[in-house]
Amino acid sequence: MKENQTTIDTAPSLKGRAEGESKRPVVAIVCGGDSSEHDVSIRSAQGIYSFIDKERFEVYIVELNGLIWEAHLDGDKRAKVSREDFSFKVGRRTVLPDFAYITIHGTPGENGILQGYFDLIHMPYSTSDVLVESMTFNKFTLNQYLKGFGVSVSESLIVRKGNEDLVTDAEITEHIGLPCFVKPNAGGSSFGVTKVKTLEQLRPAIRLAMEESDEVMVEAFMPGTELTCGCYKTAAGEHVFPVTEVVTHNEFFDYDAKYNGSVDEITPARISDDLRDRVQALTSAIYDILGCSGIIRIDYIVTKVTGEDGHERDRINMLEINTTPGMTATSFIPQQVRAAGLDIKDVLTEIIEDKL
């Protein structure tokens, strides 16, 4: 067993099927990847494996780590996965998955690279296509695109590695202001994110973010109520989940808050029915604008603004879109599925069978 390798006992029985038993479609839960979110992705894969109906599907976890692609078998056993067709050996049997359930957070599973590979080998997968994945992974590009459809987003600037001096501190403070957030333009789980309160913190924060991405987004701070809402659509219909309210005990919803319990996640959110309906409607609309597929989750922050009539109202600002959202038992999506009165096993079955 390799050093720091996570052990997951996920192999189906290798005793074979009874004579005459129909073949179950083979589902590969694809996890790992090449970003700081590798281990988070493995936890999501464990969650999905526990949720999937294994009487209906034959399920394996496939971990990607650079050019090392391995299927998890019994105990610590691993099988090399062919990059030609994504097949692998289980004993003397060659297993060729019928479907890829992608749960890589970050590259290459959340930015279109892996989707392009599966398109080339004609294997259906759980997420949106190459264009949607690449756009939603690039926070700055996504913001500019959705602004054209009237979606409210924060003011932001982009800083690129090698051209850091093209955006001056004066420009940032004038157009964005302080405090502000400095974050990798392509990344997740709040790795490399800093809330900058003083000018002296700005450049160190940019350097930290560039450890995760060659592009850094400097984003205006918006005080308000943080919400998140999941959604998926298939030929059978649309499901927009109940809204979750996120109350962090940290400076912001950082890695510690997300994964170490320093947050209250309240589902359904303590908001008015009108605001709930607006958030759910916006989530559905963005799903359609982008042409998403599979389960997505959109994060928002609701701020107070004063209208021309002098009355205060809620403005819903889109923060980011997660196209491979976390799927552990305590992640937002399973919480929202339960709150909607649905069974996560049935949800995953619907998503998989919609693509087969």
Model-derived features: where do they sit?
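ATP-dependent carboxylate activation and anion-phosphoryl transfer catalytic cores
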Residues: 2-9, 19-25, 273-356
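ATP-binding N-terminal substructure of ATP-dependent carboxylate-amine bond-forming enzymes
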Residues: 1-131, 135-137, 141, 160-171
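Phosphate-binding site of ATP-dependent enzymes
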Residues: 197-281, 301-317
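Active-site nucleotide/adenylate-binding loops and adjacent lid/helix of ATP-dependent enzymes
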Residues: 2-4, 20-31, 35, 135-224
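Hydrophobic beta-strand scaffold residues
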Residues: 59, 124-125, 153, 180, ...
